[in-house]
Regions:
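Residues within helix-turn-helix
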Residues: 18-21, 30, 37, 133, ...
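A late-sequence structural motif
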Residues: 105, 263-305
Length: 305
């Protein structure tokens, strides 16, 4: 079995669908299905259970998957080390960032990095911070920019900055009746969350970082707000809020300024997340990875939040 074939098995397991994995790998679905069947025949065990909803790993598949990921990680690290010996900087970086934050920060970092390191490819993995932490722990990414709740921060990775969690709404929203300025509060308009719990809210999934922060804020106050629309992504929630559908949570680093939109701090003490770059604990950080990390840090340092 070749290393690329290990990647096929990993892709099928992650996508839980042969058709989706085939799209990801740029293979014909029939070819990938034949590959999987052949591997299973060679090994003498079933790696996947076929169901009406896709494929799921068996116990044997879980064991195979764990070892396949380790082998791919080791191969990738050895290649990076060999590349770093005396060759020009090149290779491939697997970088993770949330789609929401990535749409604002990644293009700037990538533009800067490509100017300085045109022979290095960056493979982008867009997921929420919670999922990216798991991918890093499994050694499946080289680097990820993630957010940690303040109560979860334990000096994990390289701290970059605090990013404020804000509320976003259209200026025609009834939340405007509760907006305060000054009074010992933040340097921007702010509201007490306890006073607006009866208004319409939009929330992203609790499994995502911003969704989990919002739910914790409400839970701590014993509030059960009315959710007018549940979405899977923070970007969709914010977009709906800007159009006046309800109130949503967003990050200061992801503000889209508009005369019709207001961004509000949450309470006098505000709410923050810690942004950090994280890496596999035992991973090798190549020159290319370090250079890309530097590009991200320079972009963040140039931004005014």
């Amino acid at each position: 079995m070749e290393l690329k074939e290990l990647e096929y098995i990993v892709a099928v397991a992650e996508e839980q669908s042969i058709s989706k994995a085939a799209d990801r790998l740029y293979l014909a679905q029939s070819s990938l299905s034949q590959y999987v069947s052949r591997y299973e025949a060679e090994l003498g065990v079933k790696l996947f259970r076929r169901t009406s909803g896709g494929v799921r790993t068996t116990a044997a598949g879980d064991l195979f998957l764990k070892n396949a990921r380790q082998m791919l990680l080791q191969y990738h690290q050895v290649r990076q080390q060999l590349t770093d010996l005396d060759a020009p900087m090149e290779g491939q970086i697997h970088f993770g960032i949330s789609t929401f934050r990535g749409s604002y920060l990644f293009p700037k970092a990538m533009h800067l990095f490509r100017q300085e390191s045109p022979t290095v490819d960056v493979v982008l993995h867009e997921h929420d911070s919670i999922y990216l932490q798991r991918k890093i722990a499994a050694g499946e990414l080289d680097l990820a920019l993630v957010a940690f709740r303040e109560d979860q921060w334990e000096n994990q990775g390289k701290f970059l900055m605090k990013d404020e969690v804000l509320l976003v709404a259209n200026r025609d929203s009834p939340v405007m009746e509760y907006v305060r300025e000054g009074g010992g509060g933040p340097d921007r308009p702010w509201v007490e969350l306890s006073e607006i719990g009866h208004l319409d809210f939009l929330l992203s999934s609790r499994s995502a970082m911003l969704g989990s922060i919002a739910q914790k804020q409400f839970d701590d106050l014993g509030i059960h707000p009315k959710f007018v629309c549940g979405t899977q992504t923070a970007s969709m929630s914010a977009a709906l809020a800007r159009r006046g559908v309800g109130i949503s949570f967003t990050y200061r680093s992801c503000i889209e300024e508009s005369r019709d939109v207001i961004y509000l701090s949450i309470g006098k003490s505000r709410c923050y997340v810690n942004l950090a770059l994280i890496y596999p604990q035992e991973g090798y950080r190549s020159r290319a990875i370090r250079a890309f990390e530097n590009a991200i840090c320079r972009v963040l340092a140039s931004e005014v939040f």
